[in-house]
Every structure is written in C-alpha cells, then in structure tokens.
Curated annotation (Swiss-Prot):
Component of the viral DNA-dependent RNA polymerase which is composed of four equimolar subunits of LEF-4, LEF-8, LEF-9, and p47. Plays an essential role in late and very late gene expression. The keyword Transcription applies. Keywords: Transcription, Transcription regulation. This is DNA-directed RNA polymerase subunit LEF-9.
Amino acid sequence: MVRKIYFLTLLYFALCVNTRSCTDVIMFSFLDKTPTEFDLILDPHKLQNVAFFTNEEFKVILKNFITDLKKNQKLNYFNSLIDQLINVYTDASVKNTQPDVLAKIIKSTCVIVTDLPSNVFLKKLKTNKFTDTINYLILPHFILWDHNFVIFLNKAFNSKHENDLVDISGALQKIKLTHGVIKDQLQSKNGYAVQYLYATFLNTASFYANVQCLNGVNEIMPPRSSVKRYYGRDVDNVRAWTTRHPNISQLSTQVSDVHINESSTDWNVKVGLGIFPGANTDCDGDKKIITFLPKPNSLIDSECLLYGDPRFNFICFDKNRLSFVSQQIYYLYKNIDAMEALFKSTPLVYALWQKHKHEQFAQRLEMLLRDFCLIASSNASYLLFKQLTQLIANEEMVCGDEEIFNLGGQFVDMIKSGAKGSQNLIKSTQQYRQTLNTDIETVSSRATTSLNSYISSHNKVKVCGADIYHNTVVLQSVFIKNNYVCYKNDERTIMNICALPSEFLFPEHLLDMFIE
C-alpha cells in the first residue's frame, strides 16, 4: 500500500514538471521547526490551589506539626490526621503554632516543596533531555496524609545525620546513602557486590511483554531480537533457564527449549503451558526471568539435562515437572475416548491408567504421568505428555447463554473433571448474584470478611516462605546410610529407615505390579 502511494506521488510530481516549460526552475526550501521548550512553573499564581513551600520552610512546618500531634491525648493511628488535629485544637490550652500554614495546606489540592537539595528522591530518577532539574517534591492532598506519612517526611527532611560522622560498627544498618542503606547495598541483587566487585554491569535487560500460551511442554519462544542480541548470531537447539520470582518452589526454575521466532517484529513471549503449574505462574503481572545459556558449553548442557530437564528428571520431590493447566484438563476430559484409545496402544500405560480409576480425572492424569515415569523412564512420561498436548491442539472453548446465565454447561464438566472450581463455588456465586443493592448489612459484612481473609492470607504467604526456607536448610543435612536416616554426619542417626512413611518410599501399588 505504501509503495503504491509513493509511486502515485512520483507520477503526479513527474506530470507537474512535464506541464511546465523547460526554463521553469522549481525551488524547494525547508522551514526551521520551532524547538519545543519545557518550563517549570514555580510561580504560585499560575497554578490553582497549590501550596508552595521552600525546603527550609517545610522543615519548620513539619517540626511544629509533629509537636502539635504529640499533644493528642487520644492517639489512635487509625484516625485521620484531621480527626487528630481536631482533638488537639479543641483543647483550649493548646494553641495552634501555625494556623495560616495549616489552613493553606488543607485548602490546597497538593503541596509542592521547592529548592530541594540533591538527595535520594532525585538520584533514583532517570533524567533525560526533556526532564527539568527536578528540585521539587509534589505531595498529595492533605486528606491522604496519615501519621506514618508525616513521621516519614520528618525523617527525610529533618535528618540529624546529614553530614555527621557515624560509628560504622553500630550504624552500618542505618546509614543512608543516595541509594539506600549500606547493608542493602552489600546484600541486594543490584548493590555494590553485583555491580562493582565484578568490575562490570551485568548484561541484563527487562521489558514488559504479552504472554501467549503455547499448548506445549517446557518450551519458550522469546522475541527474535533478544536471542540475536545475546548470541550475536543465528543459533539453534538453545536452552534457557526460566525462573519465576519469588522462587519459593524447586519448580520455579525450569529448563526450557528455545524456539526461534520466524517474525522479527513479534515482541510477544510464547511460553509452553507445561511449566506453569509447577512454578505457580499466571499471566497477571508475574515476573519471569529468562536466562540464556552460553553455547556451546557442554558442562552447562549436561547440568541442565541432569537437574532441570523433564526428559531425564520428570519427578521433582512430590511434583511432576510438567503438568496440565485446568483448560487442558477439561479438553482431555472431553476427548477421553480418543485418549484411552491412545493409552491402549501401549498396554503398560493403560494398565497404570486403570490402577487409579476411582480417582478424579485431574488427579488420575498426574498419577499416571508419575507412575509411568517410575516404571518406564522420565523420557517416556515426557513423550506421553507431548502426545496428549497434540491430541487437544485444535480444541477451543466458547461460553454461551447456559454458562453465562445459569453457570451450567461447560462449568459442570469442568468441575466433574477436577480441572477447576467446585459445586460449592457455583452455589455461592448464585447466592451472591441474588444479593440486593440495598442490602447494606450483607454487603458490608462480606467486604469485612474479604478484607480480613486477604490480610491473613498475605501473612500466611510470608510465614510459609519462612517455613519453606527453614525446612530446606534442615533437609539439606539429612541423608540415608546403612538403612538409617542420618543428620549432618554418619554417627548422628535419627531413626531406622523402616520408620519412614510410605510417601517417602517407592509406591507400593507399583511394587505389587512387579511382584505379580
């Protein structure tokens, strides 16, 4: 299309020139474009309802403000600052030290502190040619301030240790540099230890990308240019580590095969669904780090195969390295006849499938892949998983009126297969749907319950993280020797191997198959 328009333009231009006499001279001139300039508005009269204070003025205001707040006899951190100030100033004995300033702050839409010295706020910002010299700080409307915010501002503006000498041994964890506390600088992943001790900045690049899910195994297809940028040449048969952060599970890091994208303008990342459940990944803003591995490097390659590749290491503790996501489970449930026909082509697979016929479909699939790996090999389970993904390659799901209005249809099969949800979820959703807008009592109690469960689950995540770390540290020192479970050394025996629960041992139903 562009080429066609360009050609027509040239044709038109040629015709115009031909219609003139040969003596005519056509002149072209280019006008200078006026440069765009950005000015910082520091004149308070040009802005509506803004409270301007210089750095020095604001320091004094904060000091007086906190002094007044300390006089509050009924201190409650959940009260707004306005409530706390009303409590203070209704007491006749307390005199407001700065009534004009306070009125100015409350009436304004925002507070701007000007003439700031160079500090942590500014150093963190990346500046470019369009950025002014940022020597101001914009604070939100006073209604959004709370007690903690004021204390934080006071620490930032009225810091006692600005130019003092401090005792390193005691204050190492408290000294603030332009980028934060020294302790963090030594320990954090972007601190001195990483950037300066290695005498180089590591070649990292991060970007936001749309994730397109591949109905596949442990495979990824990153943007073509990211592979080219790393290797500097065309490569094939490349491996990469994919790690989800925070990585609290052994399966957060997995080895993936890198497929080269044919398109050079496709900036999406395509990820195989097999590694999603293990790493607890979803596509709502999760952070995933893709680490390309040097090629050729046979040592790293062999490590990948030994520790992270489902072809050679399908089971990781009590989980499979590859699992199906709920939509795939539903599709397989729909195609159960075709799937069982595939199993019958390999008698061993069908025998294992029949072993767990009383289990729900989703659990049955997991158990089949695990058992097949233990009896045949990791690679056998990997290939079976791959075959099953190909079986449902062209499936799709479309919701109609039955699903939208009655929560029936495909939802019923999805619950039956064990892919997602439960009958109770459907029941409670229908119950919630019937709630009236005017039923304030019910809505408010649900909101409170929801908030409380959110807070408690947030706490649980932190506690679980600590527990997982603790268990890992302890279990690293546990090993089996001479039919005893030992801790740290051979002499420190904890118990006989017979006391181990059956979950730690080879599954009994598979041993029975060999004995029979």
